[in-house]
Amino acid sequence: MSEPIHTHQDSVEIAAPPEVVYGLVTSMERYGEWSSENCGGYWRKDASGTPGSGGVGDQFVGINRRAGREWKAPVEIIEREPDRRFAFVTGGTDANIALWCYTLEPSGSGTRLTESYELRNLPPLLQEGGQPAVDDRMDAMRTSIRATLEGIKTCAESDG
């Protein structure tokens, strides 16, 4: 794999145990409650017609809105370590557009939650828009990560 095009991470201290925070982080259908961009989504069904539930290999389709535009962002779960780590890749492992990772560490006050983002490959819209489009997208990611962390914190500290 080549070096990421862009990376960003941010953290928040949450006055709740890791198992509570992990339960929220892995509830992707709830991200619309916290994100400044995501407004919901759904688990894709497997060959038998059963929707995913967040296991490694399951796929979720996030519905995002920003600046008057709406789009779907399919992701594939690539790592799930209870109460410690949860990661997924936008576009699935084939397209490998962006890696999103949540790391949980026990802390004196409860849990330190870190959300990290790696832009690995440019999707067509960012390729067409050049560096200004990439810069705009990275600004949006920083805002979205902060909003998501604060939203999860508020939810976890108010008993989910």
Question: Language-model segments: which ranges?
Answer:
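Beta-strand/loop substructures that line and gate deep hydrophobic ligand-binding cavities in soluble
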Residues: 89-147, 152
